């Protein structure tokens, strides 16, 4: 093969790689992971079985207190029944294909995981007796990211439209959660706060000093809130059990 032929093949491979990474690969990865885990739980006792859920990493306060802190993250990828899985998967797909392109792959992944972790920490703090699972804490984190984008990019009509639509959806979900005891409202609010804080901390690549200070402040706020919620959850769980 000639040098020109090699260069042409290398160029084509580079373009294929670029096209691949333009796709919402993180969103697809998260969707695939939660589907695989759901199928495994279905085979291994059922996704609505409490013992199966706990075995696969659902949030369960006594085990968190015992040191299984990874349970702040694993519940994000577990779902209780087909309806729960389908609803959250549709929302993740719809939000993911928009936000991952806007924020970038690693920022999107970080916001999704960290906001979910803060949401589960809030659930740990205020729902001591519940076994909980689901992507809702992270999805509310993505809602928080849309609010941040709407506040930041005031001159972008597409982002403003998206922020208004999701702002309405957030309000409806919070009101519904307030009147429905089966909804983990604390987890949703914690995820929403986490998404907004982390979006401010990591999603603006702006070198201006005012943004640098704001990013540090909001990042520190996230860390303080996480520690506070974990402390509340720890001592409340010890008292309850």
State where each predicted segment sits.
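C-terminal transmembrane module of polytopic alpha-helical membrane proteins
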Residues: 1-22, 174-241
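N-terminal TM1-TM2 helical hairpin plus the immediately adjacent luminal interfacial "cap"
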Residues: 23-133, 181-183
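Hydrophobic alpha-helical transmembrane segments
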Residues: 27-32, 109-113, 166-167, 171, ...
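Residue-level signature of the transmembrane alpha-helical core
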Residues: 35, 113-117, 138, 143, ...
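Membrane-interface helix-boundary motifs at transmembrane edges
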Residues: 100-103, 154-160, 205-214
């Amino acid at each position: 093969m000639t040098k020109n032929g090699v260069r042409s093949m290398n160029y084509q491979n580079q373009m294929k790689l670029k096209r691949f990474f333009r796709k919402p690969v993180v969103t697809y990865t998260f969707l695939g992971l939660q589907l695989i885990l759901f199928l495994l739980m279905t085979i291994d006792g059922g996704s609505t079985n409490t013992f199966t859920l706990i075995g696969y990493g659902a949030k369960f306060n006594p085990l968190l207190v015992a040191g299984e802190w990874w349970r702040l993250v694993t519940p994000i990828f577990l779902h209780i029944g087909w309806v729960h899985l389908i609803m959250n998967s549709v929302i993740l797909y719809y939000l993911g294909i928009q936000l991952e392109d806007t924020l970038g792959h690693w920022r999107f992944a970080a916001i999704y995981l960290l906001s979910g972790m803060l949401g589960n920490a809030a659930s740990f703090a205020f729902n001591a007796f519940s076994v909980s699972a689901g992507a809702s804490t992270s999805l509310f984190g993505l809602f928080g990211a849309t609010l941040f984008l709407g506040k930041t990019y005031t001159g972008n009509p597409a982002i403003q439209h998206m922020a208004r639509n999701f702002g309405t959806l957030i309000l409806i979900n919070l009101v519904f959660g307030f009147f429905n005891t089966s909804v983990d409202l604390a987890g949703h609010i914690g995820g929403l706060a986490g998404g907004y804080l982390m979006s401010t901390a990591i999603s603006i690549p702006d070198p201006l000093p005012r943004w640098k200070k704001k990013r540090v402040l909001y990042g520190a706020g996230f860390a303080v809130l996480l520690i506070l919620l974990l402390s509340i959850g720890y001592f409340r769980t010890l008292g309850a059990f």
